[in-house]
């Protein structure tokens, strides 16, 4: 059903970024403002990690913590050229809802693939 698709065909291009020193309170405001469930932690040049809604729930009672203190480092990433089937397998095996799409040329996140995006594709293909 999805064998002809690559990650780049379904991913959302671009990501919302915060810096290492961003306070959790500001991360929460950013996530609410853009209605998203995760952000990338970057210094503009280097990708350091991600903060998901689960990370926020774990640390909600300490709003002064920084992104660096609560981020998930070394999250699983995938190439935009990867087969979508492989990305789905990774997400199912690891129990994750987001896969960040990393440029094959540089240490930069170029998009995100979420379980919502995949479910939407499944729905479109069923119709």
UniProtKB/Swiss-Prot annotation:
Cross-referenced Pfam families: CBS
GTP-binding is among the record's keywords: no
SMART domains per record: CBS
Domain CBS per the UniProt entry, residue ranges: 11-68, 71-127
Cytoplasm as UniProt keyword: no
InterPro entries assigned to the protein according to its UniProt record, in alphabetical order: CBS_dom, CBS_dom_sf, Diverse_CBS-Domain
Keywords attached to this entry: CBS domain, Repeat
PANTHER family attached to this UniProt entry: CBS DOMAIN-CONTAINING PROTEIN (PTHR43080:SF2), CBS DOMAIN-CONTAINING PROTEIN CBSX3, MITOCHONDRIAL (PTHR43080)
Protein's name in the database: Uncharacterized protein MJ0868
